[in-house]
Amino acid sequence: MGFHDVKRSKSAKDTRIIAIINQKGGVGKSTTAVNLAAALGEQGRKTLIVDFDPQGNSTSGFGIEKEDLEHCIYDALLNDVPAESLVLDTNCKKVFVIPATIQLAGAEIELVSAIARETRLKDLLEPIQDEFDFIFIDCPPSLGLLTINALTAADSVLIPIQCEYYALEGVTKLLESMKMVKSRLNKGLDTYGVLMTMYDSRTSLSNQVVEEVQSYFGDKAFKTLIPRTVKISEAPSFGEPVITYAPQNKGAKAYMNLAKEVIKRA
């Protein structure tokens, strides 16, 4: 079944295009992209993930073998392959992905001399975006041209922050980049929400980070906290989200609650 055959939610509003972004690695960007998309699919929202990270974790997170792919997002960015032909079905209902492979790493350099280099992603998503309730762009852990493309294509950002020392380190730099893109390339760019990941209620550090983030971001901080669980870490090696791998796990339940908050803000 092609993605055209799957219907959007009956209560659908405009498509939301959300860049999941934090230039720090290991904060749960791809984990959030995969599990939030799966949770939204379970709640009837047709969702697309654009894997924009050369590591391709959002691609392998659905059990897609990157070695078997003929094309990936790189080909749409630089070889004019239409995005429509890159959309793959996943093992989760109503969830689709445009995959990434390590080939995407070369795009940073190749985009430098490209015409309309900042708007490549925006332009290639335009013909298909109305097909979906939500589109998530899983950004690379850097603030280069790929990330600028993501910020130009998105209407808002979701920032995952790990509950650890120096949690807010680097966020200031990210907000500066957003401000620059907003003033020059994408006037409507906004913060959709800030998500705290790898939360451990037993440690005072986790609770301290939650307080810091909530006081810094106010009501932009999601109420749902994503716990640190073995099942969340384990699920990608089985090629599926924790939502389907261990639906009763507290991590899966947290992502289902997060999806409700995301729908409410749409």
Regions found by a protein language model. Give the residues of each.
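P-loop NTP-binding core
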Residues: 1-266
